[in-house]
């Protein structure tokens, strides 16, 4: 049975494993550090290492599952017009030009770079289709 707390879930899984292997009272105590928990289990070293890797992956999975993502925000209309106008004049920008355009548009230089790369790809695809 899985709960909301991944550490508690891991503890329950370890308890189930130990019940099938041998009895160990360590897990019945309130131990929240899974490394300490696994180190004190009376199992072969390889089994402990595999359990540690699994526990680590499980905790990462739980953290990713509960992560909130920010939604993508479209470029401002003013920025898009400026980018299109600049692209019609010049398809490749220098680092300095990217920075100046980003400041003018109120976006990051990375957004300018990606926008230009995407626009070049779209232009190439449209030309190849014709």
UniProtKB/Swiss-Prot annotation:
Keyword NAD in record: no
GO molecular function term, any single one: DNA-binding transcription factor activity, RNA polymerase II-specific
Cellular localisation: Nucleus
Pfam families referenced in this protein's UniProt entry, alphabetically: Homeodomain
The entry's DNA-binding region: 68-127
One GO CC term on file: nucleus
Cross-referenced InterPro entries: HD (IPR001356), Homeobox_CS (IPR017970), Homeodomain-like_sf (IPR009057)
SMART domains: HOX
Entry annotated with the keyword DNA-binding: yes
Keywords: DNA-binding, Homeobox, Nucleus, Transcription, Transcription regulation
Main location: nucleus
More info: There are three genetic loci for mating type genes in C.glabrata. MTL1 seems to be the expression locus that determines the mating type of the cell, whereas MTL2 (containing MTL2A1) and MTL3 (containing MTL3ALPHA1 and MTL3ALPHA2) appear to represent silenced repositories of mating type information. Haploid C.glabrata strains can switch mating type, however, neither mating nor diploid forms of C.glabrata have been observed so far.
Family indicated by similarity: Belongs to the MATA1 family.
Biological function: Mating type proteins are sequence specific DNA-binding proteins that act as master switches in yeast differentiation by controlling gene expression in a cell type-specific fashion.
Name of the featured protein: Mating-type-like protein A1
Organism this protein belongs to: Candida glabrata (strain ATCC 2001 / BCRC 20586 / JCM 3761 / NBRC 0622 / NRRL Y-65 / CBS 138) (Yeast)
Gene: MTL1A1
